[in-house]
A protein has these predicted regions:
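Amphipathic, Lys/Arg-enriched alpha-helical "gate/interface" segment within cytosolic domains
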Residues: 1-128
Length: 128
């Protein structure tokens, strides 16, 4: 499993990257699961926990950027903000490359620790 989705704190949703290397099957499952977060058509905030994430192949960077572009209207309508927990500076650079291909359509912030990301994401929901 490439990523686990924790909805126990919904509408605050935590996506934890497991450290498993991305492949065609698990990355497609990740993108489908990401889209399912919007199925309720309710306001949400996302926290991407990339503390265990591995480097992302450029092919999957492009797929992520395409997913953002394809779902831009859905994201803008329901997502109040996205916190990225990325302690690894190389992965932060890769995240920046994804956003150069397709800018993030909602407010976002990058954090080095999970607690700070959770607090910020919760505040985005409260601000709605």
């Amino acid at each position: 499993m490439y990523a686990k989705f924790d909805q126990t704190k919904a509408p605050l949703i935590i996506i934890e990257f497991t450290g498993e290397k991305a492949n065609a099957q698990n990355f497609a499952h990740y993108l489908r699961s990401l889209e399912e977060n919007y199925a309720r058509e309710e306001q949400i905030a996302l926290v991407f926990d990339a503390r265990k994430a591995l480097d992302l192949n450029p092919l999957y960077q492009m797929k992520q950027a395409h997913w953002l572009r394809k779902n831009k209207a859905l994201i803008e309508r329901y997502c109040q903000g996205v916190a990225y927990v990325v302690p690894n500076s190389f992965l932060r650079t890769m995240l920046g490359l994804v956003f150069k291909i397709q800018p993030n359509p909602v407010p976002f912030k990058v954090f080095e620790n999970l607690d700070a990301g959770l607090v910020w994401a919760a505040s985005q929901l409260e601000a709605q």
